[in-house]
Amino acid sequence: FEHMPGQCAMVCAPGVSEGMFSITSSPTNKEYQEFSIKKCGELTSYLHSLQVGDEIAVRGPYGNHFPVEDKLKGKNLLFIAGGIGLAPLRSVINYVLDNREDYGTVDILYGSRSADDLVQLKEIQEVWMKTEGVNVYLTIDREQEGWDGHVGFVPNYLKEIGFDTNKTALVCGPPIMIKFVLAGLEELGFSRDQVYTTLELRMKCGIGKCGRCNV
C-alpha cells in the first residue's frame, strides 16, 4: 500500500499480538516500507527475532499525515525529536530530502538518553549531515564516555540554539519532552500554526473508533 509521511500501520504477528507502528520510510521508496521498532515487549521481541523470508501481516496506512504537499511546501523546516520519536519524522525528513527543491532549509534537533539510544545514527551522519542546506544538532541527556557532542535535554538545547521563527516545526518524542519543547517554541516566538506534533503513542485502532486518541 501507499502511504504519506507521518502515517502508521498495524503490524500483526499471528498468534502473538499486533501493534501500531510509524512507517519510517519515505513514500518515494516504492520497493518496500520500513519500520523502526524498539525491542521492549512480547510483540517487538518477536519482530526482532524474525528472519528474512518470515511472514507477518501489515494493514494500513492509518492516521493523518504531515501536509508535505501543501502547507509545508516551500517552508524552512525544523524537526525536533526525542528517542524513538525520530521514527515518524524520518519518513518526512527523507521525503523532504528526496524532493529537496520543494523546501527551504532543514534543521534537525535530535536527542536521546545516551549515545547508544540514538537511532538511525549511521544515516544521520552519512546522509543527513552531508546534505546541503541541512543542519543536524545531536544531544544526549548525560555525560558519556566517548561522546564529544552536546550534553543536555532537548528542550534546553532548543533554547540554547534559539532558532529563528521563519520555520515550521515538527515535533515528536516522549510526552514530557513534547510539553517542554512546545513551551520552548512559544518562548522563541513560534505561533501555534507553525508547529505540528503527533499523538501516535496513543494510537491503537488507527481509525478513531476505540477512543484512545481522544484528548
Role assignments for model-derived ranges:
Residues 28, 159, 215:
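Residue-level marker of positions within ordered structural domains that often coincide
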Residues 3-5, 70-72, 207-208:
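Short glycine/proline-enriched turns and hinge-like loops at secondary-structure junctions
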Residues 42-204:
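FNR/FR-type flavoprotein reductase catalytic core
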Residues 205, 210-213:
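Short cysteine clusters
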Residues 1-54, 112-114, 142:
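Ferredoxin-reductase
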